[in-house]
């Protein structure tokens, strides 16, 4: 009887593990267009939503998207609230101390500065500027390291808040991913412009997973390798980033 009970318990554990692998819970912010955002219909949309669905189709898993605010997005992963982060998160050494990353699914791409058109800001020798960044990002770390001594770094909970405060004149410049700033400039009616040199920080964007989830990491990497090879990733980049790339294949 004891052996039967133990066997049943073991089967239950295996069944639970199998069921867990049938669903891929993807943590995302839903506030960082065109990577991930809530559309007019109140649904999650964007590059990473489509890519997540492509990964699930390739692996035979079912996608479940879980929204999280940006600041606690890594702690929520570690706590088990979802299985992988897909939220425009750059691969950095600091983050790798806490979590692992898949291979990148968006190549390293420059960050850029944005300001009111004609503001005439000298970002090479800035002084007294109010520089807006989204908190806990690679841009925030760069701004603190390079500009905090002579300028005020203003941290925002979301990218959209930083742009709103720039438009309202509450900050002088915003530093963010160029891929996210492109549509902002395009839709500003000429009120905003990108300027200054490209800022290369981060090692591309990848999916964050818990350190112990090595099998899941391997599964996701296999899927991404296949989706790059068959052109799916490049097609989604072209769709969501105005055909501008960067791409994995020529």
Where do the protein language model's features map onto the residues?
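Alpha-to-beta junction loops
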Residues: 60-62, 79-87, 129-130, 158, ...
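Sec/Tat signal peptide C-region and signal peptidase I cleavage site
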Residues: 15-20
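A ligand-binding cleft/hinge motif common to bilobed small-molecule-binding domains
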Residues: 72, 87-98, 144-145, 172-201
């Amino acid at each position: 009887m004891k052996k039967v009970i133990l066997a049943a318990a073991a089967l239950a554990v295996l069944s639970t593990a199998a069921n867990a692998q049938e669903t891929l819970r993807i943590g995302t912010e839903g506030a960082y267009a065109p990577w991930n955002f809530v559309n007019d219909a109140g649904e999650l949309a964007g590059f990473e939503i489509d890519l997540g669905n492509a990964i699930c189709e390739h692996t035979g898993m079912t996608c479940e998207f879980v929204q999280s605010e940006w600041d606690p997005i890594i702690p929520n992963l570690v706590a088990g609230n979802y299985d992988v982060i897909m939220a425009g998160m750059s691969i950095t050494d600091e983050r790798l101390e806490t979590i692992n990353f898949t291979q990148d699914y968006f190549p390293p791409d420059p960050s850029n500065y944005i300001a009111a058109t004609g503001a005439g800001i000298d970002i090479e020798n800035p002084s007294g500027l109010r520089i807006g960044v989204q908190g806990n990002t690679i841009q925030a770390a760069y701004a603190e390291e390079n500009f905090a001594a002579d300028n005020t770094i203003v941290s925002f909970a979301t990218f959209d808040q930083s742009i709103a405060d720039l438009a309202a004149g509450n900050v002088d410049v915003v530093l963010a991913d160029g891929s996210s700033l492109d549509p902002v400039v395009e839709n500003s009616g000429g009120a905003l412009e990108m300027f200054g040199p490209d800022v290369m920080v981060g090692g591309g964007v990848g999916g964050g997973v818990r350190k112990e989830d090595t099998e899941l990491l391997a599964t996701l990497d296999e899927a991404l390798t296949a989706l790059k090879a068959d052109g799916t990733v490049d097609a989604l980049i072209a769709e969501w980033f105005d055909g501008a790339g960067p791409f994995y294949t020529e």
